Each structure stands twice: as structure tokens, then as C-alpha cells.
Amino acid sequence: MRKYRRILLKISGESLAGESGYGIDAGVLESFADDIKEATDLGAEIALVIGGGNIFRGLSAAAASMDRVQADYMGMLATVINSLALQDALERKGIFTRLVTAIKMEQIAEPFIRRRAVRHLEKGRVVIFGAGTGNPYFTTDTAASLRAIEIEADVIVKGTRVEGVYDSDPEKNPNAEFFPKISYVDVIRKNLRVMDMTAITLCRENTLPIVVMNMNIKGNFTRLLKGEPIGTLVHVGEE
């Protein structure tokens, strides 16, 4: 039994780096590809957005005096590098994959056309959205929210390295409180770092649920799709 039909999976660039903190860890890439293959074998339609923080962070570079717009474009290119790496890992497992970018790169990717992206999903292809929104000042979290709404995804799944949403950083505070469910309003009120404010607001306005879960535990993604209570569900709640 599959709980969700169409899912947008958001993976941070840092998670691809593994223990090294930089670059792309082949083992992590392989593990993510295995999880996505299991999901497609269940009949789920999978779209992905990958960050670029393992290669370049535009906001950090801007803080170090680089022009913010230039830095953000460099960050967008970093997401394309990660997307190409994951596309290769998926295709080696026999999964038909399309890389779709917000910036035209005709030699390596299709331009983003909503109807075409949806058609790929309907045909059982995995769609990777690269280059963010194509505009500076917007994060890949916001890009994930936007693309999820455009393709009419049932849910955004944000893969992290912790179990879900806590009231403080569980890696620093062993007594941090875990939330199995939480409303968008409480996320905003408590200033919890689920996604940036623009991304959360987009999801709230379009009643798009978010599940935050530990992507580093093998099989978690598949268990979530089967309806097991994995991670934290961010939803409308009582407003």
C-alpha cells in the first residue's frame, strides 16, 4: 500500500558529501539511488531538488564580500553538478531520469517546462530539478516548494541527517524535543529551521504537507511511502 503518489524529495548538498563535508561521496550517492529505486518500484512518481552546499554556498560567499547575485548563480551551477551525479547513479540502476534546469543548458539538460516535467513523471521517469528557481536570492528549499506546487506533488519530503523537527539542534542538545507533527504556524512562530520562510509560506498557502526525515537511514524513504510514521509531518493544523 502506497501512501503518496507523487513526491518531491529535497536533498541537501551537504548530505551528498558524507563525512568529508565537501564534494560528493560515492557511497552516499549509491545509497540515495537505492532508496529512490525502491520508491519507483512501488510505483511512486519521484521528483528531486538537490542543494549545492557541498560545493558552493552563495550566501556564505556573499557574506565574504562577493557580489550576492554572482554568488547565487555559482550556487545554482553547484546544484547542477550534484544533479548530474545523481542522474548518473540512478541511470546505472536502470532508472529513466530527466534533468530539468531553470537555466538553459541544452547540452546536458532540458529547460523547465511544467507540462513536459509532469509528463515525464506520468511515464515513470524520475525528474531532477536543477539550478534552483533560476533567480538569485531564492534558496533551493524555495525551489523545491515551487516545483512541488507546480507539478502538484502530494508532499515534499525533506531528507536530513536527523530524525525530523526538534525545538533545538539535537546534535548539540541531547534533550531537544522532537515533534512528530507540527503546523506551519508553529514552525514560523517557534522559528524552527525546517525550511526558509519563503518556502514554508509557499507550502502553507498551497496546503502542501512537508515531511522532514532522516535520509541517512536506509529504507526510511520507502517506509514513509508505505505509510509508516517516519519523521515529522508539517501540516495545516488548527490555525
Swiss-Prot record:
Q: Where in the cell is it found?
A: Cytoplasm
Similarity-based family: Belongs to the UMP kinase family.
Q: What is its EC number?
A: 2.7.4.22
Supply the name of the protein: Uridylate kinase
Which EC class is this protein assigned? Answer: transferase
One annotated GO molecular function is:
ATP binding
Q: Which UniProt keywords apply?
A: Allosteric enzyme, ATP-binding, Cytoplasm, Kinase, Nucleotide-binding, Pyrimidine biosynthesis, Transferase
Q: Entry's Gene3D superfamilies?
A: Acetylglutamate kinase-like (3.40.1160.10)
Biochemical pathway: Pyrimidine metabolism; CTP biosynthesis via de novo pathway; UDP from UMP (UMPK route): step 1/1
According to the UniProt record, one GO cellular component term is: cytoplasm
HAMAP family in the cross-refs: PyrH_B
**Complex formation:** Homohexamer.
CDD domains from the UniProt entry: AAK_UMPK-PyrH-Ec
Q: Where does UMP bind?
A: 52, 72, 133-140
Q: Where is this region: Involved in allosteric activation by GTP?
A: 18-23
Q: What is the lineage of its organism?
A: Bacteria, Pseudomonadati, Chlorobiota, Chlorobiia, Chlorobiales
What does the function comment of this entry state? Catalyzes the reversible phosphorylation of UMP to UDP.
Per the record, the GO terms for biological process are: 'de novo' CTP biosynthetic process; UDP biosynthetic process
Keyword Cytoplasm found: yes
Its domain of life?
Bacteria
Q: Which Pfam families does the annotation name?
A: AA_kinase (PF00696)
Q: Which reaction does it catalyse?
A: UMP + ATP = UDP + ADP
- Which organism encodes this protein? Chlorobaculum tepidum (strain ATCC 49652 / DSM 12025 / NBRC 103806 / TLS) (Chlorobium tepidum)
User: What switches its activity on or off, per the activity regulation note?
Assistant: Allosterically activated by GTP. Inhibited by UTP.
InterPro entries linked: AceGlu_kinase-like_sf, Asp/Glu/Uridylate_kinase, Uridylate_kinase, Uridylate_kinase_bac
Please list the residues that bind ATP.
10-13, 53, 57, 160, 166, 169
Give the main location. Answer: cytoplasm
